[in-house]
Amino acid sequence: KNIARIVGIESTGRLRCCGADMNKLGTLDDAWLLAEDGRFAAFGRMDSLGDIAADEVVDAAGGMLFPSFCDSHTHLVYAGSREREFLDKINGLSYEEIARRGGGILNSADRLHETSEDELYAQAMERVREIAAMGTGCVEIKSGYGLSTGDELKMLRVIRRIRESVPLEVRATFLGAHAVARAYRGRQGEYVDLVCNEMLPAVAAEGLADFVDVFCDEGFFTVEETARILKAARKLGLRAKIHANELAVSGGVQVGVACDALSVDHLERMGREEIEALRGAATMPTLLPGAAFFLGMSYPPARAMIDAGLGVALASDYNPGSS
């Protein structure tokens, strides 16, 4: 009771907010809120409170109440950060140049391979407790630092343990196509075969993932490879999410829409064609400004996207090397 303002009231039950409607934020001043069995049951102004039986009464004393943050793009499970690469960045090397030198994702994969599942879980739980304390109530966590069947499954099992251990809503995404493993250098097609024919069936057999993701961008996976992986995943009941257009206009947006992806994420490199492709689509553009800031890249054209009537989601891209 005695809440100065409840922010983010949505009484119509809509699941999607786009364009100019994103500027309409429902609020209620001088309010009370009733929770039952972990869910909000009722709310109203203090002058309508009346006599409500409650096991516990919390006096907000004029505080404000905000929804928890839904962080829909993270890489929280990893074995140590890549702080040494920050020196490369400030000395002028790009993300792609660091990756070509064996850094970036491949660096994280090497370290994860040497780390046990229990240690990965312990490290990740520290990060989960940190984001929960800062207001995150729902989080998506990706694999993608394994790049082998065994290590990808290890990551996803850690995510499952996290889901079973915390009150947050946790969703798991299989990202075996984050980069081509060192063992498959020069044999990218064979690595895509591995993802489609071995990794995906193993992930599905254990029920370890809610979604599948592909890094569809210059120097990583092509549109054709992305479509093949996503179609294989769909047959196993996994819906798509895509890393797209971070480094170049890659075609990732268009293949995401064509494959009915839940979201296309990053989008630092967007043109009119990409914005038009998203108009009327179910696919949600997701922006990761922390990564753009850390990497010294241009921010995605959020205002142009909203003015075109698109919905825009924000996520942290919490990861060991670029956000």
What does each model-found stretch correspond to?
Residues K1, E56-D59, C70, T173, ...:
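Hydrophobic/aromatic beta-strand patches that form the interior of the parallel beta-sheet core
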Residues K1-D51:
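N-terminal metal-binding scaffold of metallo-dependent hydrolase/deaminase domains
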Residues I3, L33, G38, G62, ...:
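Divalent metal-coordination and catalytic microenvironments
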Residues E56, A60-Q123:
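Metal-associated gating/positioning segment near the N- to mid-region
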Residues P67, R129, A227, K231, ...:
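Alpha-helical segments flanking ligand/cofactor-binding loops in enzyme cores
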Residues L76-V77, E246, P320:
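Short active-site segment of divalent metal-dependent hydrolases/proteases
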Residues L106-A124, R129-E130, G137-S250:
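Metal-coordinating catalytic core of metallo-dependent amide/deamination hydrolases
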Residues R239-A240, V249-S323:
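Active-site-adjacent C-terminal substructures of enzyme catalytic domains
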